[in-house]
Amino acid sequence: MKNKIVSAAEAAAVIRTGDTVSISGFVGIGTPDELLLGLERRFLDGGEPAGLTLVFAAAPGDGGERGLNRLAHPGLVKRAVGGHWALVPKLAQRAVDGEIEAYNLPLGCIAQLYRDIAAKRPGLLSRVGLRTFVDPRLEGGKLNARTTEDLVSLIEVGGTEYLLYKAFPIHVALLRGTTADTAGNITMEREALSLDVLPAAMAAKNSGGLVIVQVERIAQEGSLDARRVQVPGVLVDCVVLAQPENHWQTYAQRHNGAFSGQIRVPLDRMAPLPLDERKVIARRAAMELPPGGVVNLGIGMPEGVAAVAAEERVLSYLTLTAEPGVIGGMPQGGLNFGVSLNPDAVIQQNQQFDFYDGGGLDMACLGMAQADGQGNVNVSRFGKRLAGAGGFINISQNARKLVFAGTFTAGGLQVAIEDGRLRIVREGRSRKFIEAVEQVTFSGGLAGETGQPVFYVTERCVLRRTAEGMELTEVAPGMDIGRDILAHMDFRPIVRDPRPMNPRLFQPEPMGLERWLLGLGLADRISYDAERNTLFINYEGFHVRALDDVEMVRREVEARCRAIGRRVALVVNYDGFTLDQAVSDAWF
């Protein structure tokens, strides 16, 4: 069989002017920087290829020079169709300035669209995006006046509205893996995510296009475990061996085995967050976590929810997920966003969104840049600043419970937490609760019609989107409703009888989230069956942190036994029981 190993320059030479090029990557995870660098060099050296259309689900970039930022040269790109834009600011600026045609479509819909392109279907049929800026009745996902072609249309099936995301051919797919044999079979054992490499490869191949894959090592043909091959060689045209500096696992770390499943690391040694407004918000959002549920945490403020869950020892009761395909473990933030420490599974990105879109998330906690009196939220565009929706629309529209998390105002906000009370030291310059959001990334009206529970959590108050509108439901200790809340809103929420936010949110010690979520005190864990003369003790998820906890258990069990007045049989459930090593050493 033909040897498919080529140089980056040789791979770039097969891309033609006017091609539609799909690029893998989520931040720096799976981003083929060796290939992008080769493409950039070819264009700078000879002016070709030119007029490319770029297609990317997430934003393969670092907010600076890497990823798609390499391709922002005038003339190289004619059109870009992307899900998230915040980390490709050079390309985003060209879109905002109207220098290229540009679209922002939901990340999950682009990921799913690859399958429809591969299967030669007319497009993706989905309810995701209805009543948001992606809906053609609003903006159709178009980012500037230069962009005129409709990629999204509204159709009705059986009396129900859907959006049809138009399919188009993929001429070249630029992908990344770990190992390739000389026949082009690709494995991804050191990659933190699988992303969309397989459906994108199929989309390009069935469009009559080319598939080029960057890897970090080459193996002999036939030596790879067939069950670990994620892209079969029949789909791959060229393989490029990357330089190590262009193949980091994430843009923050060269390689971490706990991201890719080679090792597991302890999660109980992480330093707790400092007690500030971010922790208060994360704690209040964490109080909505569903024990035993599946959760998505967004980028930014919601990242703190995972840290609070770890500090409070409740991660074992949850399955945290991230949209590019990780299930379980502890999702990471910053330039590691999208991966998880100690994941239970890593699936393809489009499969994750199938699960999300069908209502698989019990709860999502997402960021909130602007909200209005209808409950609409904007996180995607602010004047000349283009962030993009990413997976926000898929996730927010379909989660069974939705929590938006963010400070009440932005731009220089300073608060103090003293004696369990909140004090505003300096108010933020920008209001976030405004008359009308600049762009509708989440439709409060649609949520009201579907009955979706939606909370807006800030450091000083909590609002909820009800059938009647936005209602103020909780106020932080130390806050005056008129002075500190209503005076900094452009709309007036419903104010009935808001209750105080839980005082434990504002205390430095752990807040006892486990007991709050489970609602199960020690007395509730002990029951007696008189007919069988058996005492049942349920220690499931119970955590003994100090000798005082041991003494508390002893007293409760002795009291129950004295009340029974005779010897009993004992059945104990220790599933998920935890005994701190220091207590074990002191006791035994």
Where in this protein do the model-derived segments appear?
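Conserved phosphate- and dinucleotide-binding cores of soluble alpha/beta proteins
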Residues: 2-12, 27-44, 55, 61-72, ...
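Short, glycine-/small-residue-enriched flexible loop/hinge segments at domain edges that mediate gating
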Residues: 25, 535-543, 551-588
